[in-house]
Amino acid sequence: MATLDVNPQRYQEQLAEKVERLTDMFAPYNVPELEVFESPEQHYRMRAEFRVWHEGEDLYYIMFNQETREKYRVDQFPAASRLINDLMPLLVEAMKDNESLRRKLFQVDFLSTLSGEILVSLLYHRQLDEEWIENAKALKQRLNDEGFNLNIIGRARKMKIILDRDYVIEKLDVNGQSYIYQQVENSFTQPNGKVAEKMLEWAVDCTQESTGDLLELYCGNGNFSLALAQNFDRVLATELAKPSVESAQYNIAANKIDNVQIIRMSAEEFTEAMEGKREFRRLKDNGVDLKSYNCNTIFVDPPRAGMDVDTCKMVQGYERIMYISCNPETLKENLDILSETHNVTRFALFDQFPYTHHMEAGVLLERKA
């Protein structure tokens, strides 16, 4: 992870800069007033990764200055959740005098939750053995005895040792309703838990008066699908990454939601299926008849590269488009196409990444009369 100047005194100032930047960027699209969703000023990141430095008997976390590439010691990290900060010193202290746990350890990854669970991945430049497993189990027990709800994973080249499980269970509150999410180590999850809740509430609010079914592309672990299911008859969602699809299936079952169907395919493949260019056996195998769906609304949350032109054209076929973007530059490019047929009726900034230039935006588009 790189340098981050977490300064609560500067929070409103950096947010105002983003508001101005985003408003100016999208002025040509005749957007409505920007809805702004703030982050906690510190302890907002649910994930953090640190390199580990060995100095004689000492062992500590380090980060690198982005400009100078100089390393510096990190004992606390105000951007990370309180849970991560509470665990950081205890973890390193417990490993310092243990040869099996510290030898060739080069990185520690933390994945925490609002629900209180935390997962630690220990990364090594050596193969791990039975002795490591025994020591890691003792470490886990010791820290859980101190009040943590912790799991540990050991990683080395072509090696992954899971002591109990490689995921955490997160609980996000959406308008007073709690949703359960399995979040697997090394797969994508929203990094800012409190802002993730606000994004879900905004999406639910935008689709309140919906009719028919929802189509969702790039659904990840079902983050939005589950919360949006209440506003639609059925939800058909696609995702390419296998671990995310498996988590989405887990989450559908855990939340007892019966109107969401997830298919493992890319947005590009789905576009071909919708246009009848190709038949996909996995649609048949999953009992999915695309013609039976009555989707007036499409929800997209693409990667940083945005949507390709063909997917944009396919998306234009829907009455309403909800688009969550982690890269306003590519959202702008996509809006050049989408605004030919649709107007932006809602416009939001979610401050997922305070004190950085990154912005997360949301738009609702409705077909022009």
Curated annotation (Swiss-Prot):
Organism this protein belongs to: Vibrio parahaemolyticus serotype O3:K6 (strain RIMD 2210633)
The family this protein is said to belong to: Belongs to the class I-like SAM-binding methyltransferase superfamily. RNA M5U methyltransferase family. TrmA subfamily.
PROSITE patterns: SAM_MT_RNA_M5U, TRMA_1, TRMA_2
A biological-process GO annotation: tRNA methylation
Function: Dual-specificity methyltransferase that catalyzes the formation of 5-methyluridine at position 54 (m5U54) in all tRNAs, and that of position 341 (m5U341) in tmRNA (transfer-mRNA).
Binding site for S-adenosyl-L-methionine: Q190, Y218, N223, E239, D301
Catalytic reaction equation(s): uridine(54) in tRNA + S-adenosyl-L-methionine = 5-methyluridine(54) in tRNA + S-adenosyl-L-homocysteine + H(+); uridine(341) in tmRNA + S-adenosyl-L-methionine = 5-methyluridine(341) in tmRNA + S-adenosyl-L-homocysteine + H(+)
Top EC class, one word: transferase
Gene3D superfamilies the record matches: 2.40.50.1070, Vaccinia Virus protein VP39
Active site annotation, chain numbering: C326 (nucleophile), E360 (proton acceptor)
Highest taxon of source: Bacteria
Keyword Methyltransferase applies: yes
GO annotations of cellular component type: cytosol
EC number: 2.1.1.-, 2.1.1.35
Protein known as: tRNA/tmRNA (uracil-C(5))-methyltransferase
UniProtKB keywords: Methyltransferase, S-adenosyl-L-methionine, Transferase, tRNA processing
Name of encoding gene: trmA
Transferase as UniProt keyword: yes
InterPro entries named in the record: MeTrfase_TrmA_AS (IPR030390), MeTrfase_TrmA_CS (IPR030391), SAM-dependent_MTases_sf (IPR029063), TrmA_MeTrfase (IPR011869), U5_MeTrfase_fam (IPR010280)
GO molecular function annotations of the record: rRNA binding; tRNA (uracil(54)-C5)-methyltransferase activity, S-adenosyl methionine-dependent; tRNA binding
